[in-house]
Amino acid sequence: MIVLDEHLEGLGLEIVIGHWYPGKVSVIQKFRPGTLVKDDVIPVLLRQAKQPTFITINWPDFWRRASADKRYCLICFPLPRERTHEIPDLLRQVLKLKQFNTKAGRMGTVMRVTKKSVHYYRINDPQVYTLSI
């Protein structure tokens, strides 16, 4: 399951990603309809889903601040809102990497993705690793 942050809702990303991603694509608000979902609640909501991969452009609040958790994956894209159309292609590249091409390979990982690389850390390992894409 791919879960998009509230900043990405209504931009058509659900549809574009849904064309090639075989699982469900949703937005975080569907986990708590009718309420504002604050960043500190997102990990709690993600733990309720089955192996979700959370996508956000709000990287300052998650990258190196969020703890990796074996029940989900966080992927941060340091992009301004006007460049969010780049997310589906970048996400697809990340999901093709052998380290992250399965849910099991992604769980427990926090990533920051740019056009050229994926920086990531994992549960119980605070070291940041880098892969080229």
Mark where each language-model region is.
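A short beta-strand-loop structural module common to alpha/beta enzyme folds
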Residues: 23-33
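Conserved beta-strand termini and adjacent loop/short-helix elements that scaffold enzyme active sites
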Residues: 28-30, 57, 77, 113
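Acidic, PIN/NYN-like endoribonuclease modules and their adjacent C-terminal/linker elements
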Residues: 1-6, 10-21, 40, 62-133
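Short, solvent-exposed coil/turn elements at secondary-structure transition points
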Residues: 31-33, 60, 80
